[in-house]
Amino acid sequence: MRTSFRPILFAAILFAALFVLPSNIKAQPPQEVMNAAETKLALKKLNILGSALYVAAHPDDENTSLLAYLSGERKVCAAYLSVTRGDGGQNLIGTEQGALLGLVRTQELLAARRIDGAQQFFTRAIDFGYSKSPEETFAVWGREAVLSDVVWVIRRFRPDVIITRFPTTGEGGHGQHTASAILAVEAFEAAGDPARFPEQLKYVETWKPKRLMWNGFSRGGGGAQANRSGLISVDVGAYNSLLGKSYTEIAANSRSMHKSQGFGSAERRGSALNTLQTIAGDAPGADLFDGVDLSWRRVPGGEAVGKILEEAERTYEPENPQASLPLLIRAHREMSKLPADNSWVE
């Protein structure tokens, strides 16, 4: 049976859309009951069918502002793939080291995702401390084994866009950082190739993302600013009027979950431009999701579902949320008519 990490799980939506945050991955911790504004946002997200996967090496490497923006402003299924669990980091809040520290930092990542709205994935790779080069890193990790894990996540989550935190050219300052970017590039191609890791195809199908981007930075005139080709800007400082917060404020709270590393940042509002440079795939025009159908039309026969969900969002009553149930039931019935092999409904 083919499976995906990003289904809407509509069997639970009749309650989840009104009372709890929808869960797109069974391993995620349960969410708290939503208020009226969060419920409205959840209804909006039901009508957006898109996904983005952020890839880096460790817990705390992720760009929480971009994840919050993707989940809240673009309303796509966003996820962070941390290649390791941070076993080799410091611990400022306890005595745990090694694998036990990895457990602590795993929980910190899950806590961060509950705030910024993204999902969380890992591979089998161990953080063994500072590494001077990607070659040294791969010698410890086992390149093909970890690559297979990254390919597995891509084939199951099926992202439209993949974004790396670090470049493949070493400016990340850590061998594991560079290795995570190299793996993302290799997995971008391998996930769509049935000859690569064919044993996975018993459970998943091949998947080819639309594009691979680098979330660039500029240091000493280098980084993304050194090559303007295929470069776009994203303002992750946008304000969410439903939540009464900007995505940088949400991100600050998310990042502050990395307590063992002493990480945290002050909440702030205002424009916060991020640069994204095309590494592989189709270069976007002005928008990260150019060329990607984010509507229910991407599922054969799904247009009727989209229209019903639009009506549910438009007629939602904050003081009478149960009034949306008849429309959600109609949408559920329409979803039951969709092809069984679509990856958006389970």
List each language-model region with its residue ranges.
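Metal-dependent de-N-acetylase/amidase catalytic core
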Residues: 2, 6, 25-53, 133-137, ...
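Bacterial N-terminal signal peptides
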Residues: 8-22
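Active-site rim/loop-helix segments in enzyme catalytic domains that contact anionic ligands
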Residues: 28-156, 178, 185-189, 193
